[in-house]
């Protein structure tokens, strides 16, 4: 995968984290916890795709060209699911942020502190496992790929936290839509190239 494609995949994966961080900042999530959250999201976006990449590489060795087709379909499917979720959230007026805010300490949630941060970081990193699997099936530069994904996810999370108070919910749903479109486009491009 060329560098631009890798960056686009990483940005697409970071849109969930950006949206969540924007909403968390609107809900009063600030200070040390906010920066710990950004770093944790970055780490999750390194280790989740890493696990997926190794599973994908194993599948690639076993199945050859079929694995590349499966990888492309996984990316396109993840993008389609992101689009579907964004569409449903827009129709119902809800968002992932609203569901997750209840776990923040002081907001009546069950989880607190580090557990809440781990839960939220994991929830926005699950897509990275599947995307890592898809990328592993086409043999990519593993260290470069996971470090790029982690850095971009942490950066997008930090930007979401910084911009949250000013931007409101304007970018939240739109970012998820853009991320879904990017993943679908890259998956289709990979599929055509197989």
Curated annotation (Swiss-Prot):
Q: How does it sit in the membrane?
A: Multi-pass membrane protein
Chief location: membrane
- InterPro entries reported for this sequence: Mntp/YtaF, Put_MntP
What is the name attached to this protein's record? Putative manganese efflux pump MntP
Give the originating organism.
Moorella thermoacetica (strain ATCC 39073 / JCM 9320)
Q: Does the keyword Cell membrane apply?
A: yes
Q: Domain of life here?
A: Bacteria
Give TM segment ranges.
6-26, 35-55, 66-86, 109-129, 142-162, 174-194
Gene Ontology MF term list: manganese ion transmembrane transporter activity
